[in-house]
Regions:
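Acidic donor-binding loop of glycosyltransferase active sites
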Residues: 162-179, 194
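Conserved acidic donor-binding segment of nucleotide-sugar-dependent glycosyltransferases
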Residues: 210-222, 231-237
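Membrane-proximal helix-turn-helix segments that form the acceptor-binding/catalytic region
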Residues: 9, 15-16, 29-51
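Acidic anion/phosphate-binding donor-loop and adjacent secondary structure
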Residues: 63, 67-68, 72-87, 100
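Conserved donor-binding/catalytic core segment of Leloir-type glycosyltransferases
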Residues: 82-108, 120-122, 243
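A short, well-ordered alpha-helix in the C-terminal region of glycosyltransferases
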Residues: 224-227, 231, 238-253
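Nucleotide-activated donor-binding/catalytic signature segment of Leloir-type glycosyltransferases, i.e.
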Residues: 124, 132-160
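Short, small-residue-biased leader/transition segments that mark boundaries at the very start
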Residues: 1-3
Length: 270
């Protein structure tokens, strides 16, 4: 690499926190990985002219020469207004225990007591270490007819399933990497007018205070989650308002267009 070159580096993850959350790494391996990344990060500052950060929280470890550019979705027409709802609940994203896989199963089991035919669409990759346990848990709890595992799908096809769903889920566990980062799935739900139920982290609550497109709840409170979902099913006026608010907020602010302009300006001025 020529030192005279100007390099802009894009950071989309808090890598150290991500390493700490890897359950398949033993403590020694985590320590080696973290120290290695820390050294690499320090050395990178000798070569990188500017950093693009996907979250405000990343400013804590990249304080200078950085610009926050949020990973908002590109607005597309998914014809969501004319789609028949086939799924009561939907989740899009990697399916792991920390991202709420077992929480969603427990919630569905509770909901099934009052809504026997309730169904959940799970869209995303399931790591091999969890896949067998997840399938066994679904079968053991008699939820084979209530949960559909779509696996990994391209973005457009995944959004077609989201369009066919009533309520989006984002019940991430209170891990530091999640608490301080916006999950893009919230904006995916908003784009097609799907109200969502999410974890009650301060960052998420701040978003809800601005756009009023969903509801937040303690992700470890299964009864509370279930009651919140049933409340949305039963209150069509509230449901419709949340749906409209999400679409309006996404179109006005939480889309890629404004971020794209920031990115172009940054690169042109670098």
């Amino acid at each position: 690499m020529c030192i005279r070159d100007r390099v802009v580096y894009d950071i989309h993850e808090n890598t150290i926190q991500s390493i700490l959350q890897k359950k398949w790494l033993n403590p020694f391996a985590k320590l080696i990985a973290i120290v290695g990344y820390f050294i690499l990060e320090k050395l990178s500052k000798l070569f990188f002219h500017h950093y693009i950060l996907a979250e405000d929280s990343y400013k804590s470890f990249i304080k200078n020469n950085s610009t926050v550019i949020y990973n908002y979705p590109i607005i597309k027409d998914y014809n969501h207004q004319n789609v028949k709802k086939e799924y009561d609940l939907v989740y899009i994203g990697d399916i792991t225990e920390d991202r709420g896989a077992l929480i969603m199963i427990k919630t569905l089991l509770t909901l099934k007591k009052s809504i026997p035919k309730i169904n959940l669409a799970l869209i995303g990759n399931v790591p091999p270490i969890l896949e067998d346990a997840l399938i066994r848990s679904i079968s053991r709890n008699g939820l084979d007819n209530n949960i559909r595992l779509f696996g990994y799908m391209n973005y457009y096809d995944a959004m077609q399933i989201v369009c066919k769903s009533k309520i989006g889920l984002c019940l991430l566990k209170p891990k530091k990497n999640y608490i301080e980062s916006y999950p893009t799935k919230l904006f995916d739900y908003m784009q097609v007018g799907v109200p969502f139920v999410c974890s009650n982290f301060p960052l998420y609550d701040n978003l809800l205070n601005k756009c009023n497109a969903g509801l937040s709840i303690d992700p470890l409170n299964i009864k509370g989650i279930s009651s919140t979902i049933i409340g949305l099913f039963d209150d069509s006026e509230k449901y419709n308002n949340l749906s409209k608010n999400g679409i309006n907020a996404l179109n006005k602010e939480y889309n890629w267009l404004a971020q794209e302009n920031k990115l172009f300006h940054l690169i042109q001025s670098s």
